[in-house]
Curated annotation (Swiss-Prot):
Residues carrying the site annotation Important for catalytic activity: H248
Species whose genome carries this gene: Sus scrofa
Lineage per the UniProt record: Eukaryota, Metazoa, Chordata, Craniata, Vertebrata
Cellular localization per UniProt: Endoplasmic reticulum membrane
Protein name: Fat storage-inducing transmembrane protein 1
Purpose: Plays an important role in the formation of lipid droplets (LDs) which are storage organelles at the center of lipid and energy homeostasis. Directly binds to diacylglycerol (DAGs) and triacylglycerol.
Domain of life: Eukaryota
Annotated TM spans: 19-39, 55-75, 95-115, 142-162, 188-208, 221-241, 250-270
Length: 290
């Protein structure tokens, strides 16, 4: 006979719990939205500063030139000292794939939302095609340098026996070793990706200043690119500390910087190029973004 009031009380309690959970979810979503808005605004302002962008080049140079000195002050047994560590396998070895995926999504959204023109969007995305060509071309050039400067060695109990055999592929298949000048492809790629991402992401500050659509998806994609840029900086530091010879790292970073200069610093400012980041997107005077 008393089940009616008990059941009613139970239903009322569950309803209150659902209401509280609904309110909690709304609060969490509001906090997440506020953090997303604030974080994207601050990151855009930071990356869009011309002064800080110039300092960023100096930062990368300092990392490559002076970073190897830290090898005397760090634990040589840390996980980052192993070639087989998770970050080296999953991120560094596929750095261009990660960069192209994240940055491609960002460029696609920014350009299309700003212009609503497929042709302009495709033109800006072609910078990533050029970047892929630079990456592939540099990799082949590094292998050619190693072939031209190398010699074949056969491991023996007493040491190494030098062979006057120029065919590197057949010598490696026979179990011999090929030693030549090896430009650090990881240092090259991470340096190039850092400079490229910093250049592309800097456009977001001007995008916001012009009051263009900047919803949560775009802001999230932008912040993911910022996080990836931070990861590349960290992994570049790990690379110069733990791996490769000093000159190999410096040359790799120098080639990456030179590749950035030839493209973003020179060619992309010409009319017969893919265009520099932000070119042709902002045709109206900027206004404060609310």
């Amino acid at each position: 006979m008393e089940r009616g009031p008990v059941v009613g009380a139970g239903l009322g309690a569950r309803a209150r719990i659902r209401t509280l959970l609904g309110c909690l979810v709304k609060v969490l979503l509001w906090v997440a939205s506020a953090l997303l808005y604030f974080g994207s605004e601050q990151a855009a302002r930071l990356l869009g500063s011309p002064c800080l962008r110039r300092l960023y080049h100096a930062w990368l140079a300092a990392v490559v030139i002076f970073g190897p000195l830290l090898q005397f002050h760090v634990n040589p047994r840390t996980i980052f000292a192993s070639h087989g560590n998770f970050f080296n396998i999953k991120f560094v070895n596929s750095a261009w794939g990660w960069t192209c995926t994240f940055l491609g999504g960002f460029v696609l959204l920014v350009v299309f939302l700003a212009t609503r023109r497929v042709a302009v969007t495709a033109r800006h995305l072609s910078r990533l095609v050029v970047g892929a060509a630079v990456w592939r071309g540099a990799g082949r050039a590094f292998l050619l340098i190693e072939d031209l400067t190398g010699s074949c060695f056969e491991p023996l109990p007493q040491g190494l026996l030098l062979h006057e055999l120029p065919d590197r592929r057949s010598r490696l298949a026979a179990g011999h070793q090929w030693r030549g000048y090896t430009v650090s492809s990881h240092t090259f790629l991470l340096t190039f990706c850092c400079l490229l991402m910093a250049e592309e992401a800097a456009v977001f500050a001007k995008y916001l200043a012009h009051g263009l659509p900047a919803g949560a998806p775009l802001r999230l994609v932008f912040l993911l690119n910022v996080l990836l840029l931070g990861l590349w900086n960290f992994l570049l530091l790990c690379t110069v500390i733990y791996f490769h010879q000093y000159t190999h790292k410096v040359v790799g970073a120098a080639v990456g910087t030179f590749a950035w200069y030839l493209t973003y610093g020179s060619w992309y400012h010409q009319p017969w190029s893919p265009g520099s980041p932000g070119h042709g997107l902002f045709t109206h005077p900027s206004r404060k973004h609310n």
